[in-house]
Amino acid sequence: MKAYAMLKIGATGWIEKPRPVCGPNDAIIRPLAVAPCTSDVHTVWEGGIGERHNMVLGHEGCGVVDEVGSEVKSFKVGDRVLVAAITPEWNSVNAQAGYPMHSGGMLGGWKFSNVKDGMFAEYFHVNDAEGNLALMPEGMDLADACMLSDMIPTGFHANELADIQYGVALSFFCAGPVGLMAIAGAALKGAGRIIVVDSRPDIVEIAKAYGATDYIDFKKVSVVDEILKWTNNEGVEKVLISGGGSTILETAIKVLRPGGKIGNVNYFGAGEFLTIPRVEWGVGMAHKAIHGGLMLGGRLRLEKLARLIMTKKLDPSKMITHRFKGFEHIEEALFLMKDKPKDLIKSVVIF
């Protein structure tokens, strides 16, 4: 089968691969739409997870069931399905402990374009299909369905990590597609003030449409000074991080008030260490909590988030700026995510 792969760090291209084999608990999916992600960029061009050779990229997509294993009862050939980017082994010890995303070890639920081939192919494999697939609601837009793989659940998970509650004031760093979904999630949870920190004026109106109340351009002013000024020098109760370099954590701690929480879903793709400012962290005793996590994936989460779209409580289409028609446009869509032109938020390829 034809597939688009990471050839090695810094290089991608089209290759031929065998069709994946379906085990008794698995499913083989023919993609209907896929979406490149900034994580693919970190993996290929920053070497974020180390060297990979001829590994098929892609962890965001939806499709139609082409084959199911003998133990799969809830899905049949021809079903249109949603697929999460994170596909845990749901009978694992870590899943039973409440951390399915780490089944089999740290980040073990992240399989696509990490430890196995991803979705940018004519067919892709899904393990533990009963737990990792969900039926696509009738009439759902395919591009919206792709956003359920990663952008929506990851953005919403930032809110869970920071324990967003009614009326809180929070700051949000990096309003890319995951960030916009984090903003939407915070608004749905009832956050009272949502301060967006980014450098792209074009994104402000979209961020406001999802619930942002204030905007800071970090290229024009000091983020720390501005947030402290706006909060009477107290800082915000919560900080959500979905992007940025290794220093962004330092800024987050500086603007967080004592007792506050940071919810990080950012993939730090480069550097060996992340630094914490000693004084602003209360020399270790400020009760400023840093909570970073990988979203959990799974059928139940997919079904719940799909319900928000179908009842029009969430509209991910606002952030899809580039739509391509045809499998052959995967490379073009990926390089858009790498080059980040000013008008880009998210690209999607519909087959």
Curated annotation (Swiss-Prot):
Transmembrane segments: none annotated. It comes from Mycoplasma pneumoniae (strain ATCC 29342 / M129 / Subtype 1). Its cofactor is Zn(2+). Belongs to the zinc-containing alcohol dehydrogenase family. PROSITE patterns: ADH_ZINC. One of its GO terms (molecular function) is isopropanol dehydrogenase (NADP+) activity. Binds 1 zinc ion per subunit. NADP(+) binds at A175, G176, P177, V178, D198, S199, R200, V265, N266, Y267, K340. Its EC number is 1.1.1.80. Alcohol dehydrogenase with a preference for medium chain secondary alcohols, such as 2-butanol and isopropanol. Has very low activity with primary alcohols, such as ethanol. Under physiological conditions, the enzyme reduces aldehydes and 2-ketones to produce secondary alcohols. Is also active with acetaldehyde and propionaldehyde. Keywords: Metal-binding, NADP, Oxidoreductase, Zinc. It catalyses: propan-2-ol + NADP(+) = acetone + NADPH + H(+). It holds the Pfam family ADH_zinc_N. This is Probable NADP-dependent isopropanol dehydrogenase.
